Amino acid sequence: MNGSEQAQSAEAAGMTSSADRMVGMDHAEVRYFTSYDHHGIHEEMLKDDVRTRSYRDSIYQNRHIFKDKVVLDVGCGTGILSMFAAKAGAKHVIGVDMSSIIEKAKQIVACNGLSDRITLLQGKMEEVVLPYPKVDIIISEWMGYFLLYESMLDTVLYARDRYLVPGGKIFPDKATMYLAAIEDGEYKDDKIGFWDNVYGFDYSPMKEIALTEPLVDTVELKALVTDPCPIITLDLYTVTPADLAFKVPFTLAAKRSDFIHAVIAWFDIEFGACHKPITFSTGPHAKYTHWKQTVFYLRDVLTVEEEEVVSGVLENKPNDKNKRDLDINISYKFETTDNLRYSEGSCSYRMC
């Protein structure tokens, strides 16, 4: 059986409704997968010029890497990365996605005359049967808010360990997370302080909920009080699922005298397998992406002077009940000769 016949056989074997596939699946998993059934989320991602162009350029500018190779697209969505790979000369591309949007992806692939070179399979990566025993390249857009929220990185790692040939390539292959502290008094008062007086009533119990929910929003560069601090780099060739729960130190040096109301996080992505490496950032210094930045408001307001340092530890782990949610703890200490400004604390957050 040749590659095309294998692909047709794999597609035929996978013709089961989305509802049937999700029977017995955990409710949180069903909610996650069905959220990608709607066109709006795909429109937002495709319109993210930084995201989509970075993937396109990393593939098109490295046609010599993709030529005559078998490529696996993990979480293929509407198939844009699969089509980039096919256009770059891949021998065959296999796209896998659990969402029912894959039916539209098949139509899109057909509209673009690529059905003979792209096989799209609906199902979980751990359960589908690929038409090839091994692949030369894995491509995936797996990143979530705060890099790992609702992330499918563990699925990419499964695909790497199960299907990638020795010496195979992963696009992208590196992710680095950064922290910085910001002045954001006005917004914090609106989001947190609001609960102190709601039409004359004390709603302060709601502040606890508000403080534990990170905010995903665009932060202006001028709000940064400290220099960025890289806290962790994930190398997709070597990282393991266990590494996705981590506890890392950070040091934030003030670049001006100001107040600190929150800590923000963002990530940079690198396509290091390229002849000329391609990178993009989701930070406040870079062009807008749909990932924005993640804001963690602190209970205390810190008053820092230029060159003073806030040190601490960030701990991240998947939630025990829903592995796609994150439990995050940030502990910090601000030591200064001025005892009135000394501050130390710990805040716990839940991304859900």
Regions found by a protein language model. Give the residues of each.
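Class I SAM-binding transferase module
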Residues: 1-74, 78-352
